[in-house]
Amino acid sequence: MSEQIQIDTGAFQRRVNKLLSCWKDSSADFEQLNQVDSLLVVMGGQNDDLIYSKTTAIHSWLLGYEFPSTVILFTKDSVTFVTSASKAVHLEPLKRSSTGFNLEILKRSKDEASNRALWDDLVSRIDAQGSKVGCLPKDKPIGKFADEWQSVFEKAQSSKDFKMIDVSASLSAVWATKDDDEIKAIRYASKMSSAVMSGYFENEMSTILDEGKKVTHEQLSERIEGKLDDTKLWKRVKGLEGADLSLADWCYTPIVQSGGEYDLKTSAVSSTKRLQGADGNGGVVIASMGIKYRNYCSNIGRTYLIDPHNSQQKMYAFLHEIQTQLADKHLRAGATCKEIYSKAVEIVRAKDEKLVASFVKNVGFGIGLEFRDSAYVLSAKNNRALQRDMVVNLSVGFQDLDDPNHKGEVYSLLLIDTLRINDNAPATFLTDRVRGTNDMSFFFKDDEEEEEEEERRSPAKPDGKVTPGGKVLRNKNRGAAHDDTAAEKMKLHQKELAKQKQEDGLARFAGEDGEGNASNEKVFKKFESYKRENLLPTKVADLKIMVDHRAQSIILPIYGYAVPFHINTLKNVSKSDEGEYTYLRLNFVTPGQIAGKKEDVPFDDPDATFVRSMSYRSSDSSRFTELFREITELRKSATKREAEEKELADVVEQDKLILTKSRAYTLPEVFPRPAMEGKRVPGDLTIHQNGLRFSSPLRPDQKIDLLFSNMKHLFFQPCDKELIVIVHIHLKSPIMIGKRKAKDIQFYREASDVQFDETGNRKRKYRSGDEDEIELEQEERRRRSQLNKEFKVFAERIAEASEGRVSVDVPYRELGFNGVPFRTNVLLQPTTDCLVHLTDPPFLVITLTDVEIVHLERVQFGLQSFDMVFVFSDFSRAPMHVTSIPTTSLDDVKQWLDSVDICVTEGAVNLNWGAIMKTVNEDPYDFFAEGGWGFLQSGSDDGGSSESESGSEFGSEMDDGQEETDEDSDSGSDFGDSAEDESGSEGFEDESEEGEDWDELERKAARADEKKRRQQGGSDDDEDSGKKGKRR
């Protein structure tokens, strides 16, 4: 374990300097720190009973780890560690990076005399600074090390008259504002907390109540705790890319409460009573949980209403309104904790004075390395001000309200989220916020029970403002409460999704480092011709111009020295003849050139001195001609190699396939796509320990290995209404098959055999009618059914062998619609997680979780088709266009997209997506701050392109914008290989080259016919009109 410890020296440097800077700050937040001459932090042995303390927090903040049995002494210009020799090994690298302060490490040993001398040295250092010593009195170190130091320091304290001052509150202020790394850790923790709450607890709790299982609060809490190790859960969570899940842990044991006994404090525990709420009279379940990542905490709490009374729903909606107002209007940098709580009380008092007594005594606290930072409690007595980039745990609730469903009993409501404080903008939710309290209600009553209950009640005038909703289990429909039409519900849902996208965008790009543009920044590349001088060719002694193909360099003689220049530093070379001399001029890439954007490359030090050009002359014309040819060819080969490397940059080198030693499952006689080199031959697909292997006995030298770790999606497409049955695998990263890279690999078998007409044979002689045709049809149906069964079982075995990495997804043909994703009009079919076309290459696989927003273009009355644009969350990828979708499919497409929680907008014209995405990538945060994707819904009718008349304008629009794309391609505005990202059809590039679509060809044909008709004087009007209206 010790070998794995790596301290972030940069973070240590920044944070020590921040501490020393705050020490010198005279503001009220650092009042105690200003009073002391030195700061002493003592960590004793491991104390499992003490989870959170200022001592462990300062260790985690500075070092990223806890160093037991260690003393840290801070002065205003130095840091001193006293620790064991084994721990000192990990601290030594910090000495090399310490600037602005001195760093010393005193190493303890087993020699008591030398240890005593260390203690005396430390006491003298404290005494030299002054008598006022900052300390953390609430932290009580334990163990032999702590006892030894304590005895030494108590004696010194009596003789030196040291005055101990508690600086806990000041330290809280020092690390209250979080840097980007800390925010990232808390965001990971918050995502995980939200995932457990919504992805597991909701379903588990509702199932327990629905099926009447007898499970206690404590048992359910233990189940929740066990989900931390559930890798399947985390694979489904978006936003955890790059997170090391081994660094996650629970902040506290999850809390579950129900049945009229509720404690809204953070110290509450789950009782041994059973989960209640499904007794027919309703109930309230409160759950709170928090996960920490790299010791940075998060927290989330929710209340679930079971068959709630109308007054309970209204009260929960009011609590949600309180949280929304605090987050959107009052949680800002500069506001004091006291002001926040006062605003919350004002909102409650305005609703009902009596509710103030039931309202919580504080509305949250600062959260981070400590789960509850006592210096930043949002209560009525705390005058500390919030700061930008602080993270708070906002907790609002009502305690012990009268339960209308159970006379004489009470219920409580609680809503907790983790938020980041901004300057002049609403606080950012790091946990998934509650959009509406209707989704937090569960209904178990039958319609008949509800009708009987309504009959018993006195008739009352219905409240038109109450929004129906809630989760209904086992199809127990509450249809009488649903007044909104499907279209209105979709519109409301889309508004919520759009608002969520806007907030997520602001949160995602709020960091000062411009997080979103990191992938587009140009990277300085260092080229090295020769590592040592003795590696230069021996011929350089002749001081002649040389071209070294092996080192990819040109060696030029300059003032008696042989100077190598890497070929990538060369811009161009020219040769000219003047009189009896031949001139060779070499121009190099340098900063500040007035040149094309391809030369706009970064430099290690732009202010250094550069050689811009070199000219040589010689009377040996043939020699310079040969040099010019060699340099030109070397430059061409370097450019070609660079292009190939860029093309294959995303291709991964897979690990070795581990062959299974036992009997392996095999799918025989299948064909691969893309096909391997040579003639098409069938082969066997076999499941091994960590992946699949396709091999053919006819070509033993060729095989395809696919590892489970590189699989992203697994599809099974039956042969119903198709000619082939397919098992299709979409990879995370492309692999090489032969000389082509592929991201989509499929294995198929043809569904129909060649049939022979048996007319005139013996069997036909004794049969009449269509018995043969009927028998053939029945045989084909049996064959298709058998093929479907065989391929489906094999796909399920792949999913089982992958141990949860992939699951089998089947396209829903009934939800399919026609469109043109590349050049051909094909059937596109939704699956659970994707939109796919798998029947013919080029394949299309769009992962829905990667989609940011979908925009429908050319949606206007009178047109027969529309276009669909998928914008991806990774803005560096080009949007994916699917054109010429029949207008008859518009409502079905919108309903499908809405059902998978994708934000949908629509407009009447085609947009210039190259320019739009360039703007987004330049400053994503500014884009979202100015409204984000809202312009697509409100302003798309006004922008950019002319209206279409009969077909898609996308093809012609791309042609018109091609010059701009070429010019801007090197400025960071061009995208990655989006077609390769979305489909593994690289092997079929010859089938999917750019060209005009049918609509464009028809328009050209129509114009040609019109021109011909005019020349002939209108004699063929009728015929031309017929041709013009004809569609393919």
Curated annotation (Swiss-Prot):
One term under GO cellular component: FACT complex
Bias (Acidic residues) ranges: 956-1000
InterPro entries xrefs: Creatin/AminoP/Spt16_N (IPR029149), Creatinase/aminopeptidase-like (IPR036005), FACT-SPT16_Nlobe (IPR029148), Fact-SPT16_PH (IPR056595), FACT_SPT16_C (IPR048969), FACT_SPT16_M (IPR013953), Pept_M24 (IPR000994), PH-like_dom_sf (IPR011993)
Gene Ontology terms: biological process: constitutive heterochromatin formation; DNA repair; DNA-templated DNA replication; nucleosome assembly; positive regulation of RNA polymerase II transcription preinitiation complex assembly; regulation of sister chromatid cohesion; transcription elongation by RNA polymerase II
KW DNA-binding (keyword) present: no
Record keyword Coiled coil present: yes
Residue spans of biased composition, Low complexity class: 938-955
Ranges in coiled-coil conformation: 633-653, 778-803, 996-1017
Residue ranges, annotated region (Disordered): 443-485, 936-1032
Biased composition (Basic and acidic residues): 455-464, 1001-1012
UniProt family annotation: Belongs to the peptidase M24 family. SPT16 subfamily.
Subunit note: Forms a stable heterodimer with POB3. The SPT16-POB3 dimer weakly associates with multiple molecules of NHP6 to form the FACT complex.
Protein name (record): FACT complex subunit SPT16
Taxonomic path: Eukaryota, Fungi, Dikarya, Basidiomycota, Ustilaginomycotina
